[in-house]
Amino acid sequence: MKLILITTALLQSLLFASFSGNIVDKNTSAPIINAIISDSIISVKSDENGSFTIDTNETNIHIKAYGYRPYKINFENNTTNLKLESITVKALYLTFWAANTTSKRIKKILNMIDDTEVNALVIDIKNEYGSTVFKTSFEQANSYGAHKNRTNRDIENFMQLLKSKNIYTIARIVTFKDELQASNNPDYAIKKIDGTIWRNHDNMAWVDPYDVRSHEYAISMAEEAAKVGFDEINFDYIRFPAKAGLKFCETNNQENRVKTIGEFLDLAQSRLRKYGVFISVDTYGNICWSNDDNNIGQTVLSLAKHADYISPMLYPSGFASGSFYFEYPSEHPYAVIYRSIKNIKDRIDSKRVRPWLQYFKDYAHTKRHYRKFEVREQIRATEDINTSGWMMWSPSSRYHLNYFVKEDE
């Protein structure tokens, strides 16, 4: 028996090696507390001195810390003093149709990045219809023809171009709204009470978030984005439809909805751990002013527990007349952003909030055009409330360079 125990201990020591290090800010050398150090199986956190030890036999070790670029440990450098580069993400949305090296839109945006504060892009990888921007190795999606409308025929070269400019890359994955997946799998599509597939106003079907097959599908797609080198996975439509009278495979109540979204994110964190990517989730802007799940399965507290960043869509035009005591919230872009984020600081550190900002005409009230003043006021609010940055939503990905040049530059 003693020999067996000694042999077991010896095998464990041979199989698992301890790696220790210290994580500091690249510019200030200050220790980074609660950084997440992961191999494909386990994660540990750095202590108050930025120190950590991880027992692993793997050579790919990744570090994530809020407000920093992801970091991959290079064992060839034989260093234990690990310096992370801080980043305040300032991102533009890049539409599905422009996400390739030859589009005129991407060329203009890359020139803009060279000359402005913009340092990141949110890129459609799977859109609302279910189409993928490049042909992945995910055979289930390919069997549905998800790649047929792809606009990027050389994703490796595209990613290399972005990395050469030190652009922080965010892969947008539309999660449960997926016409292709739902129409090819009617057994787990969201149904109307009569049993037929429900489609919303744009004639798009959704898959049932309660069915784990919908989780596997979206996370498999996220893995494809992680494999080609994205820094972050952004899950959009990671919610239940905001509509009553639909049929699901489980009892549809707040407890079950919130639990289901949490389980999805836990699985995503587990499966994506080995790639070292951050996970962000998109939410309605009114999540900042609500304590319940608004019938869609999202609360600030529940998302903060499972995701790295939350991205409320704080479009001033999306708030009803009378919100914030303003007749027209769209005329007060600074106040809408600042007050909304301030209202959730007791539930999540503002450094883990990166809102979507409005870069389109007011559609709800005064039809006000959002030009440089409105854009800069929104950005100023994110700076004053100390968020992790911002993401600008222009549905067409058309942007003006001078909107993103600070006045003092």
Where are these regions (language model features)?
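Substrate-binding cleft of secreted/luminal carbohydrate-active enzymes
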Residues: 307-319, 330-337, 343-344, 349-409
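Short, ordered, surface-exposed loop/turn motifs in non-cytosolic proteins
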Residues: 19, 27-41
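Glycine-rich, aromatic-flanked loop segments that form ligand/cofactor-binding clefts
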Residues: 120-125, 151-199, 234
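Short, acidic Ser/Thr/Gly-rich low-complexity loop/linker segments typical of extracellular
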Residues: 30-31, 41-54
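Active-site-adjacent "subsite" loops/lids of carbohydrate-active enzymes
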Residues: 87-101, 160, 176-224, 376
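Aromatic-lined carbohydrate-recognition surfaces of secreted/lumenal glycan-active proteins
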Residues: 168-178, 234, 257-296, 337, ...
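Extracellular beta-sheet/turn segments enriched in Thr/Pro/Gly and aliphatic residues
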Residues: 74-90
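A short, solvent-exposed loop/turn motif at the edges and junctions
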Residues: 62-73
